[in-house]
Amino acid sequence: MIDLIFPDGSARQYADGSTGRDVAASISKSLEKKALLIKLDGKLLDLDRPLTPDLLGGGNRFEIITRDSPDALEVIRHDTAHVLAEAVQELFPGTQVTIGPNVEDGFYYDFARDEPFSLDDLPKIEERMRQIVDRDEKIRREEVDRDAAIADFEAMGESYKAQIIRDLPASDTITVYHQGEKWKDLCRGPHLPSTKAVGKAFKLTKLAGAYWRGDQNNAQLQRIYGTSWATEADLEAHLKRIEEAERRDHRKLGKTMDLFHIQEEGKGMVFWHPKGWTLYLALEAYMRRRLDAAGYREVKTPQILDKSLWERSGHAEKFGHAMFMCESAEGEVLAVKPMNCPGHIQIFNVGQKSYRELPLRMAEFGACHRYEPSGAMHGIMRVRAFTQDDAHIFCREEQVTEESARFIELLRSVYSDLGMHLADTKFSTRPELRAGEDAVWDKAEAALSAAAEAAGETLVLQEGEGAFYGPKLEFSLKDAIGRVWQCGTLQLDFVLPERLDAEYVAEDGSKKRPVMLHRAILGSFERFIGILLENYAGHLPLWLAPVQVVVATITSDADDYAQRVAERLTSMGIRAEVDFRNEKINYKIREHSLAKVPVIAVVGRKEAENGEVALRRLGGEGQKVLSLEDAVRALTEEATPPDLARDRAVAAPAELAQA
């Protein structure tokens, strides 16, 4: 007999070999009909998998998974990928299947086929997929002999599957899943009971190229992407989100707002246009003020350093594949820096440091370069050249919790100023392969956890996902349409100071290694600007907008007045331009609205005579007529960055008291 413990804490006994379906049926017929999978000690398994003592992990925690469970969704997506593969092979005989995982919001499958798929093929494939769902093909797991499986897949013409099996560790159990009587795939599972359980809430979304095992030296494959959901309503909501995301695409906004471009001769390198660079500098100036106020000292380190430094730091071994290397005429092997931390330790190491000088907070807006494959790059969000809002805090062990908590408070404040808020904070603990003693890891993990709790953060645990040199916190934002972006990081490092010989004189006169906290808030300026553009759909807060006000004339006899208005705004720090063109005012308004200018100040003969401006807001209806000075006062206040606005609010009562 086997003992199972249910989520409510109750326990029942079942005969060896009972399945999840048997357990569901013993509870109720309705649950048996709804059941799709089981979860045993946290692991998802097929509903019809026999439950035996060797399968139970000892905890015997048992749960029946139905369609409305989040756990079911990833399996629904995986099964949809299998239905896609069967449909493709039915419609296009001779096509080989390779891999087909579920991914965020959907799935894909990579196919080996001489003739390329076209977008016109996708509706045909979708229709065949629906037919396969209607056929209610039973999905059955089978453990097979390794050599027999290789021979079987080779005989089927599935050389990629045979190669996957050959490369699996000898200790691995080889499992095949049958889908109906005619189709099968190599897979670990788990899977749903039948294709009918997949449902029809799916859609194929795009085609892409891929390489076998992600290596451009291998065969090129064709990838079909799709999305799959538990219900039609969920699918419809997702498609609307995609439509909205396309409308907000930072690449389109970058063009219509004239912010930046990327071209073939500089793949993954951003050409910032004047307006885009103005936005960049506004964000950089804000971050510089926030770091300065928080006690950071800004530094600048070289772009290119001798490879030997990267070998000592360990980066050449861990990140060598992503580093740009070059050789000088004198035979020096140099590397363009992929990150800033080794350079910061070089600055720390100049001169003897005392415990009294710690914590030492060192910041750099450091330009870094990392190789990204062409297919992986995406606008300014994933590039080869980027600038990090990077900083490293050198501190004593007993300062880690306080410094971490201070950083989290700063991070939250910055995100709030930028109109973004934390979605979650992930806590990644020691990986299997790691440096350092367990006792040191115990202290490090406890310190980060305590800091997060002190800052009021609820942590999402990611066991074994920490860096090899220390645990880390990852901070994710949720944007206006519900997408989550991982941006901020806080990593505790007790390895790099050892490797690069960083030390300070302790209170007792002994030499000790500082603890190093790697931290970033934005991550990179390029990516974060892309996130901001998409979050705001280009309608940035006034203080960040590259052009804050356009003064647009109705008739040419208001040109002189328009120029005076622009000069008055500019004198107060407002980024203003004048549109004197001989075009209708509605045309000008439409054009500047498409360029996402937040405020259009309309002036004509009447406004010139009265010393007024008619303010029209982006996305608003109508306009508000104000005197020039009232408009300047209101816009100046609104265009003040939030940190400066707070400083002025604090200073105002003190000034009044002195008066």
Curated annotation (Swiss-Prot):
EC class: ligase
Keywords: Aminoacyl-tRNA synthetase, ATP-binding, Cytoplasm, Ligase, Metal-binding, Nucleotide-binding, Protein biosynthesis, RNA-binding, tRNA-binding, Zinc
Cofactor note: Binds 1 zinc ion per subunit.
PROSITE patterns: AA_TRNA_LIGASE_II (PS50862), TGS (PS51880)
Pfam families (alphabetical): HGTP_anticodon, TGS, tRNA-synt_2b, tRNA_SAD
Region span, Catalytic: 249-541
Cofactor(s) of this protein: Zn(2+)
SUPFAM superfamilies in the record: Class II aaRS ABD-related (SSF52954), Class II aaRS and biotin synthetases (SSF55681), TGS-like (SSF81271), ThrRS/AlaRS common domain (SSF55186)
EC number: 6.1.1.3
Cellular component terms (Gene Ontology): cytoplasm
Any one GO BP annotation for this protein: threonyl-tRNA aminoacylation
Region (Disordered): 637-659
Primary location recorded for the protein, binned into one broad class: cytoplasm
Example GO molecular function: tRNA binding
Entry-linked InterPro entries: aa-tRNA-synt_IIb (IPR002314), aa-tRNA-synth_II (IPR006195), aa-tRNA-synth_II/BPL/LPL (IPR045864), Anticodon-bd (IPR004154), Anticodon-bd_dom_sf (IPR036621), Beta-grasp_dom_sf (IPR012675), TGS (IPR004095), TGS-like (IPR012676)
NCBIfam families (alphabetical): thrS
Quaternary organization: Homodimer.
Protein name: Threonine--tRNA ligase
Annotated organism of origin: Caulobacter sp. (strain K31)
